[in-house]
Amino acid sequence: MQNTKAYEPGDFIVKQGEASQGFCILKSGTLEVVKGSKVITELDVPGTIFGEMSDILGEPRVSDVRAKDEALVMHIEKSIDDLIVQDPGIAKKLIYTIAKRLEQTTSMLEHL
């Protein structure tokens, strides 16, 4: 099941520690990924997938995601495994998303 929801600045899309209910796709706006009181990164590219790691690993959310400005987010309330079987193209998008995050993390670690 999927639904699209509008968020106002400061609204939380996902909360750290929550059980995964699927994953999300940013349709418009800017989101902040927050750990504690620190903003880790911003998401502002339409089509960006987030929240997928908790779904893949079956673990609680590791950070908060909140709207920095008005944002539109699609919630996919279906397991990624089931979705990949129905739409194999989503697997390529997920692999790309995870690879880009790994690249960014590696780059950040190199500069420490």
Regions found by a protein language model. Name each.
Residues 1-34:
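Regulatory nucleotide-sensing modules
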Residues 2, 96-112:
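Polybasic "coupling" helices that flank or enter modular domains
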Residues 33, 92, 102-103:
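A short hydrophobic/aromatic micro-motif that marks alpha-helical segments and, especially, helix-coil
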Residues 13-15, 83, 106-109:
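Short helix-to-loop capping/linker segments positioned immediately adjacent to catalytic or ligand/cofactor-binding
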Residues 12, 42-95:
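Cyclic-nucleotide recognition modules
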